[in-house]
Amino acid sequence: MLRTMLKSKIHRATVTQADLHYVGSVTVDQDLLDAADLLPGEQVAIVDINNGSRLETYVIPGKRGSGVIGINGAAAHLVHTGDLVILIAYGQMDDAEARAYQPRVVHVDSANQVIDLNADTSTAAAGTAGAPVPNPLADPA
């Protein structure tokens, strides 16, 4: 049996561009791809922290050091410039590998530059938690 496990995650990246008319994918700064051990064409889930949207696509490399996180194609209807997102890649592995595997968790600053790289999936990097996202259903009183 294979288990599907978290392989890598880029946590709380800021979307820098959204291009509805591009053919698809997400453009990611090559430095972030390297830090997260993501390959061009690799499948990722994108979770939008601002609005709760979740989608799947594949990555294409962006200019190294640019901080680019570009949402391309139809996904630009769901994820917008300035939104905070989490990019997640999963891997399939056998039971023994899954029990020993350490994911790559990349924390970035507001300019999408790496500030922490570890395997801890439960702790935010210092100073990155930010203000809570407002609940649109909450009573404004």
Curated annotation (Swiss-Prot):
GO cellular component terms listed in the entry, alphabetical order: cytosol
Residues binding substrate: T57, G73, A74, A75
Main location: cytoplasm
Catalytic site positions: S25 (schiff-base intermediate with substrate), Y58 (proton donor)
GO BP term (any one): pantothenate biosynthetic process
Cell location: Cytoplasm
Physiological role: Catalyzes the pyruvoyl-dependent decarboxylation of aspartate to produce beta-alanine.
Identification of the protein by name: Aspartate 1-decarboxylase
Native source organism of the sequence: Salinispora arenicola (strain CNS-205)
Lineage: Bacteria, Bacillati, Actinomycetota, Actinomycetes, Micromonosporales
